């Protein structure tokens, strides 16, 4: 029976129906699984992160700079745009009113108003000191000869510093003649030394700072009653382009000196004021 079957009986045996299907099913299953495995998984879209370092800064406009930073106007800038104007009696009147407005009543302020008659002709910025003094005081020689009272002067010139006082004294040569001139400032000169000099002989002309002159009046070293002319070095400017009345300390001392009888002397018409 074994011989009937033959040696290669398996080769002629029909393939079972399930075999191809199984093989095909396996192949299809593998293909299907492969396709599933090879489908790309969609990646999550990343939101762009904002980098603060890479941001481009917008240039600041001129308007924003101006609003943040305000530059104070300098006197030099103001003078560069306008011509210098000589001082006037109205300038002094305004300063007096502004200085005393917070401490004096309305009636007292009216009493401090200086009469126009007490003001001499002002410097129009064309004069030297000698030429200006000759114009406002043509009878100086006669006054100088008749003045013999000690502890007093005929004319006072107020300025802002000792250095400026020395400059003014040097420029007085053409005017003073034989008049005795005295330095009235604090630099290198003690008050007591100046008091002794004023007691020793009659002085015709004094040039100095309001602070030292005020101190001499306080110590009875200087009597203001014989004074005939009080001249302010009004228009001159220092290295910072400040006039003497632009400096708060000097301005305060000037008004303190005016309070020591100058106002009453002006109203009695015995004292004249000049703005050089």
Curated annotation (Swiss-Prot):
The modification Phosphothreonine is found at residue 209. It comes from the Eukaryota. The modification Phosphoserine is found at residues 19, 23. Residues 1-91 are annotated as: Disordered. Residues 1-10 have a biased composition (Acidic residues). The modification Omega-N-methylarginine is found at residue 164. Transmembrane segments: none annotated. Keywords: Methylation, Phosphoprotein. Belongs to the CMS1 family. This is Protein CMSS1. It comes from Rattus norvegicus (Rat).
